[in-house]
């Protein structure tokens, strides 16, 4: 069974790797997932962590007197060093097997159609893979642009802020992969809300409006009978 560990603790957090980052002492939620990922959360930023370590990574504990240090190390030698001052809650739970996100019919069909006609994203675009799996879920499409750069594409029927946030999380994770980086983002939807477009533009994510009716009229190998 899949187990997740939730810890609420007064702690400081230091990231040591290609760069350094420090979070001063505060009460935070520490999330340890069965896939090996570790994330540090505050009571804001919605679901976006303050810092995290993607799998594979390993947790060890160093003695630190009154403040033990939990050290999370990934295969590249980067570390999250969590100095635990006080633990208020520590529990583990079995979540079972998750069925995964089920897209509605239109979104699923948009993904199929855009994968077949990826040139709608731009001249020279090629498809690498549909449902490109990451530690936090599948990216709808992973493509290459005309210059060979990696592009992550998130597809929605209605483009709202939560979709931009989802793509942002994928991009932050994918850009840690030295093989893929730098990875650009495209937010594609039938309709994109103004607030979502503004947020995407601010984060360097390109928005593409999809004409579903026109795309359905295109020649499709998947749905051809003869």
Curated annotation (Swiss-Prot):
One of its GO terms (cellular component) is cytoplasm. Its main location: cytoplasm. Keywords: Cytoplasm, DNA-binding, Endonuclease, Hydrolase, Nuclease. GO terms for molecular function: DNA binding; single-stranded DNA endodeoxyribonuclease activity. Its EC number is 3.1.-.-. It is found in: Cytoplasm. It is an enzyme of class 3 (hydrolase). InterPro entries: Endonuclease_NucS, NucS_C, NucS_N, NucS_N_sf, tRNA_endonuc-like_dom_sf. Belongs to the NucS endonuclease family. Cleaves both 3' and 5' ssDNA extremities of branched DNA structures. This is Endonuclease NucS. It comes from Mycobacterium ulcerans (strain Agy99). The gene is nucS.
């Amino acid at each position: 069974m899949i187990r997740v560990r939730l810890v609420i603790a007064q702690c400081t957090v230091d990231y040591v790797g290609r760069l350094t980052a420090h979070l001063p002492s505060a009460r935070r939620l520490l999330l340890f997932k069965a896939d090996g990922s570790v994330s540090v959360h505050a009571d804001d930023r919605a679901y976006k962590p303050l810092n995290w370590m993607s799998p594979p990574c390993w947790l060890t504990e160093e003695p630190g007197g009154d403040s033990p240090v939990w050290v999370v190390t990934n295969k590249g030698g980067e570390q999250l060093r969590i100095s635990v001052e006080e633990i208020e809650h520590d529990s583990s739970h079995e979540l079972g097997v998750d069925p995964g996100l089920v897209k509605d019919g239109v979104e699923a069909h948009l993904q199929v159609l855009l994968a077949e006609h990826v040139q709608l994203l731009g001249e020279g675009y090629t498809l690498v893979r549909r449902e490109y799996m990451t530690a936090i879920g599948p990216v709808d499409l992973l493509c290459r642009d005309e210059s060979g750069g990696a592009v992550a594409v998130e597809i929605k029927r209605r483009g709202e802020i939560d979709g931009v946030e989802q793509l942002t999380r994928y991009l932050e994770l994918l850009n840690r992969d030295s093989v893929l980086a730098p990875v650009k983002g495209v937010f594609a939807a039938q309709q994109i809300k103004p607030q979502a477009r503004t947020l995407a533009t601010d984060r360097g994510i390109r928005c593409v409006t999809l004409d579903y009716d026109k795309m359905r009229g295109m020649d499709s190998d998947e749905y051809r009978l003869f």
